[in-house]
Amino acid sequence: YSYRQDGANTYLKRIHYGNRLSRLGVDRRRPLFLDERRAEATDWNFELVFDYGDHDAENPTPRESHPWPSRSDSFSNRRAGFEVRTSRRCERVLMFHHFEELAMPSGCLVRSTDFHYDDGAIYSFLTSVTHKGWRHTGSSYVTQSMPPVEFEYSQPRIGDEVKVADISDGLPMGIDGTTYRMV
């Protein structure tokens, strides 16, 4: 796998699997860790890519083709006093095959899972997920989609009144997570 770093947050970018050549050592054991340099040098059959809006919409490839966009509803979590900001949103998950012997180009898109959102300035909701099949036709792709799985949410009521929260109101105490009470 590989990932991209954005501040303190880490975003999964790609997963490779189905290596053509064995990575077993001379003692017939798997290496404990496969560093990124060796992973990139390995000839993989399958590549799962997480598209955060940085891949072409009509003719995607395994490599990014656009700048990495920020989401309009970025948010932060704080754990042990550190801010972890989420400023990216996965738009699609792309499955690429690397089988030249099947008369398809290396990095041929075969399937995608597309996420559709209802965007707001303060929040966004996942509204549907669509699975697509892709077939390479030489210079472009032909797609067919399954019916989308759709989601509905109750809308939040955001008021102008500021309320004071107090520990006696049942708020969890501390920042280490040991005194949280699940109800």
Language-model region placement:
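Conserved catalytic cores of ATP-dependent inositol ring kinases
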Residues: 1-183
